[in-house]
């Protein structure tokens, strides 16, 4: 019953299969060599290489996780024994080479024990939950315990799990592959596989009453951050949620307040912020956006990746982008903290990435006037701090006479030449 409901759908041989670390499958696919190729071409190339090894004999037989595990053990051994396998089984091995969790972690970490542990916790946390299993059932329009492991592997291939893990590892440790601390990377990744969270809610019958009958609901994809009663347990839980949110995995929505958020960063995998209310303090609004507008934030990385789609490693992409920024005369904050419009011109306008600040304004609400006033105050606040946004700076000058604008400018050059 539990398997059908989604819990424990990956178990025994199927879990061992998707988390196995095979040298043969790891070496069968080199992401850098296939960079820019169509997925169909990549699969065809790997499959052709498999057939050229003369290790396989195609037969008609069902593809089970137990059989594939035995085949992989033979492939990793020195024996030349022929492996009887079906066309479907060969396709599954191809998919495993590209995106199986065990192979992807092994390719990244280069250590079987670390990769096996990380992949097992990843699969148990992501794919052995009923709500995630339901997503895959809907996506593949099939609910079967026997073929669930194939769907999981294909799902990881379609989502390019290898690229996801590579980017996450880069954010944890920016050094080149040979210099990285793989133990630290593995530990930080495991910390992001957060368990289910429970949230107490009021019912319509108990709302506003002193004696409340509260219900506990599970929260998965959206979670609250922080707690009014910051006990040690609540503090630890808040830290776990923060680490999970700063990862490519759930939760994808974080509900928080402005209180006590100074110094906290949520920029690794977030570029949108929705303001539930409009603060009267411009510094408060600035600090809210500052949580996701920081060093190598998500919108920065996405733009840098679009500058050089032919480049494989993140270090190389940022080095090339920095060289371009230097040639254009930009300071060393570019492209790590921000990317000027002049550099974004090389990207199609519809593909450019920005920080998105969403303010819901309801009809006939006083928030309309309050928001207009706040934008005006924010422009002046940034001017005062010496960090204006170009579009806001131009907006403040739009209705001013030219002679008044000249009075606001001052010359910082060492020699002032009069006309």
Q: Which role fits each region the language model picked out?
A:
Residues 1-254, 258-419:
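Helicase-associated low-complexity regulatory tails and linkers flanking the ATPase motor
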């Amino acid at each position: 019953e539990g398997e059908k409901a989604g819990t424990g759908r990956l178990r025994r041989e199927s879990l061992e299969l998707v988390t196995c670390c095979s040298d043969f499958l790891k070496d069968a696919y080199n992401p850098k060599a296939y960079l820019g190729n169509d997925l169909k071409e990549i699969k065809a190339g790997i499959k052709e290489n498999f057939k050229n090894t003369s290790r396989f004999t195609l037969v008609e037989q069902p593809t089970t996780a137990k059989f594939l595990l035995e085949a992989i053990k033979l492939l990793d051994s020195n024996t030349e024994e022929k492996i009887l396998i079906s066309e479907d089984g060969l396709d599954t091995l191809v998919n495993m080479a590209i995106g199986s969790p065990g192979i992807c972690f092994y390719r990244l970490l280069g250590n079987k024990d670390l990769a096996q542990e990380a992949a097992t916790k990843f699969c148990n946390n992501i794919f052995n939950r009923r709500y995630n299993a339901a997503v895959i059932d809907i996506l593949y329009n099939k609910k079967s315990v026997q073929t669930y492991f194939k769907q999981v592997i294909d799902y990881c291939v379609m989502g390019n799990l290898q690229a996801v893990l590579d980017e996450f590892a880069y954010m944890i440790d920016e050094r080149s592959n040979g210099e990285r601390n793989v133990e630290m990377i593995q530990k930080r990744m495991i910390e992001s596989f957060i368990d289910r969270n429970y949230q107490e809610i009021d019912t319509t019958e108990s709302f506003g009453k002193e004696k409340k009958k509260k219900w506990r609901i599970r929260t998965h994809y959206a979670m609250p951050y922080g707690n009014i009663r910051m006990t040690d347990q609540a503090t630890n839980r808040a830290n776990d949620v923060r680490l999970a949110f700063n990862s490519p995995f759930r939760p994808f929505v974080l509900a928080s307040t402005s209180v006590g958020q100074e110094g906290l960063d949520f920029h690794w995998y977030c570029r949108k912020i929705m303001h539930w209310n409009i603060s009267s303090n411009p510094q408060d609004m600035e600090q809210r956006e500052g949580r996701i507008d920081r060093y190598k934030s998500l919108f920065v990385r996405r733009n840098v990746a679009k500058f050089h789609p032919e480049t494989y490693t993140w270090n190389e992409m940022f080095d090339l982008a920095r060289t371009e920024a230097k040639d254009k005369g930009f300071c060393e904050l570019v492209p790590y903290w921000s990317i000027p419009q002049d550099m974004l011109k090389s990207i199609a306008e519809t593909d450019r990435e920005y920080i998105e600040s969403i303010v819901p304004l309801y009809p006939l609400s006083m928030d309309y006037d309050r928001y207009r006033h706040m934008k005006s105050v924010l422009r002046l606040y940034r001017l005062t701090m010496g960090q204006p946004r170009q579009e806001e700076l131009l907006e403040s000058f739009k209705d001013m006479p030219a002679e008044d604008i000249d009075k606001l400018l001052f010359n910082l050059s060492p020699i002032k030449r009069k006309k």
